[in-house]
Amino acid sequence: MTEQQENKQRAIDLLESRYRGMENVCETIDMRLRMYFEDLLEHSSAREDDPNDWHGLYELLGGAKFLRCLDTYNFNTKKVQTVIRLREGEWRQDEGVWRHISGGLKCPGIAGGQVYRWAPFQVFALASIYGFYAWIDTQVPAGSKPQLLRTEREKDGTIWDYRRLCTDFTLTGSRKIDKTGFGGFIGMEFMLFEDYNMEGFCCANSEDRAKIIFRRIKYLLSGLDTENRFRLTESLAAWRDKYSEISTASIRPMTAGGKFKDGWFAQLCLKDEFGAAPYANGKSDMKMLVDVIESSMGPRREPLSVTMTSAGRITEGPFIQILDGLHGMLEREQSIAKGEVQPVLTDDRTMTLLLEPDAWQKEEQYLLTNKTVRHKVNPMLGVIVQHQFYDDQIAKAQRDGDTGEVIAKLFNVYSSGKVTKWITGDRIRPLQVAKRIEDCKYIDQGRERWKVFCGMDFSHGDDLYAHGYLAVDYLPSNTMRGRFFFDCDAWVLEKTMMESPNRPLYEEWVSQGWLKVCPGEVFDSI
């Protein structure tokens, strides 16, 4: 086995160890949740070209994280079951076939509006978002409020609030896994059952894309609006004024690059196809839009950001960086299991379902010829999309001489993901030493041995400001021996870190001493 395959085998072992004993707990929540975990274990392998290998490393680690959280935090089973039934209604199994009995909401289908039953992976996603609850330290001094909310209590000198744990969820996979239906349902649920004055936003790279999920939300709302309670236009879905005693919730589409204003008070941000947003001249219109929306969530008790995306035909983009951060967060599950690090609440507020090929499967030829990898990126294979669809699309792309779209959208692999890394972390880690740049001060016979080169990466305040140091130990010229030492320092504004989607990763770097936080609006690197 390669090191990558050994790492995946450890993930399989971790998932199995956490799942054993939790079978009945998962079944009590929903039988499909148990089915999901048992499918993960039954159809996962670390052996190359194993036809039984249907799940990738980061899906497995996401499942392992869910089980740890299930053993750590409170879980609102009734809430999850209510959310599940809201769209699918009641079903009964008849001679091995599930048949719709009553209730639920009709969704668009090839035969018109139909009520669909959630698939096991979708039940896992809904449980990840709606199930977990935790006491959150608001850091407001005890006794400072004349009256506590019914969800609040005073403890250890501050006020704690009982809240939904998940504030950020990422679903990434290929086309045709009903990402639109999933996001549209969440938007509708927030319109009905979340904050009285909920504000939601459907964010996308183009106007047409932004309106796809928005129109699905309107479709679902219109299906249950027998009393004309909602105002549904091309740019707004909202409760009508005469129902303001019930709710003033609203949701609207937003387009990257368009004109948008401050003053929003968002509780929900749906980010559709964020993975296709590129950087242009170091900036991303989509990221700027998302930053504006998410930065308005500060006062909300239970905000939620949901990313639904497949890969894009790009090599650099904001979501690629976010995805790298999510990978790192999930990889820490193995360190948590070993007791090397402790779980972090801010990390646990981010949940994922990452449907990706494994690292050794991202070469173009492998993707285009190996049918097993299709299961890893599309759990709806054989349900709403067929193998023949993949075969036809691959054949057409090869005839046209352009396989980029197929690789990105049907296999969820970025162009950057097909590039072999020159120097990997596995090669660097054994060379690390417990020294910093300040230690490079050796003087030999009155002559300084170390020479240091410094590169500076400046920031306008929306990213890190960093110094990279390369130190060279000059030995006498008649020898080929020498030493090189690399080190770095980085600074981030406190406001930037608090609002960044990479905040859990930044906080880990702060705790390890690699990142320094600067209050105010000025970087202090002295």
Residue ranges and their predicted role:
Residues 218, 471-526:
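Nucleic-acid-processing active sites and adjacent nucleic-acid-binding tracks
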Residues 2-456:
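Phosphate/NTP-binding elements of NTP-utilizing enzymes
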Residues 448-474:
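Gly/Thr-rich phosphate-binding beta-strand-loop-beta motif of the actin/hexokinase/Hsp70
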